[in-house]
Regions:
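Membrane-proximal alpha-helical anchors
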Residues: 2-69
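Juxtamembrane loop-transmembrane helix junctions in multi-pass integral membrane proteins
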Residues: 3-6, 77, 81
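Sequence-level detector for tyrosine residue identity
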Residues: 4, 22-23, 36, 66, ...
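Generic signal for short, ordered secondary-structure residues
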Residues: 9, 71-77, 88, 103
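Generic detection of intrinsically disordered/low-complexity segments and helix-coil linkers/edges
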Residues: 15-17, 57, 76, 103, ...
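Context-gated lysine
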Residues: 32-34, 40, 67, 72, ...
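Membrane-interacting alpha-helical segments
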Residues: 55, 60-78, 127-135
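An amphipathic alpha-helical interaction surface
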Residues: 80-166
């Protein structure tokens, strides 16, 4: 025969298990919602005329070497160009941080950006690396992380979409 105390222990344990399951499920749903919001933010930003113009401007910059880049687009020499460039690059560094922390899904990001973001990285990688050597060793590390993750997705899928981008 089952006594009252045993039933009480069983129901307490069952209640705690149900509460834990509910809490974990709620956390998972909140994380999915946050990932969706972050992708939505990127899509909304990317589809603006201003962002398209920034992308074209960033991709059309030309320079011979790091010193020439500084002369044309450096913070002291050309603050407007510097701000425009680095605000654009920082956006991808921030996205890389979100991917690293699980706040944005790399598969989703890869599907919506594919070659455009890695092409920016390829163009500016020498500038970023020189910037790191000159005193900013962590400059754009999350942008680099994002690119590495995108390459992993490309290899995993076997699409070789990014093969020519290094």
């Amino acid at each position: 025969m089952v006594d009252y105390q045993t039933l009480s222990i069983v129901f307490t344990g069952l209640s705690i298990s149900i509460a834990a399951f509910y809490y974990i499920n709620t956390l998972r749903n909140a994380q999915k919602a946050k990932r969706y919001e972050n992708i939505k933010w990127f899509l909304e930003r990317r589809s603006t005329t201003e962002d398209m113009l920034n992308f074209a401007w960033v991709q059309n910059q030309e320079w011979e070497d790091y010193k020439d880049h500084l002369r044309k687009y450096g913070m002291k020499e050309n603050p407007e160009a510097w701000a425009r460039l680095w605000s654009y690059l920082i956006m991808f560094d921030d996205i890389g941080l979100m991917v690293r922390r699980g706040l944005m899904d790399i598969e989703d990001f890869y599907d919506i950006s594919q070659r455009s973001i890695p092409s920016v990285w390829k163009k500016y990688q020498p500038i970023i690396e020189e910037h790191r050597k000159r005193g900013e060793p962590t400059s754009m590390i999350d942008f680099e992380y994002l690119i590495n993750e995108m390459h992993s997705v490309s290899k995993r899928r076997g699409d070789n979409l990014l093969a020519d981008l290094g």
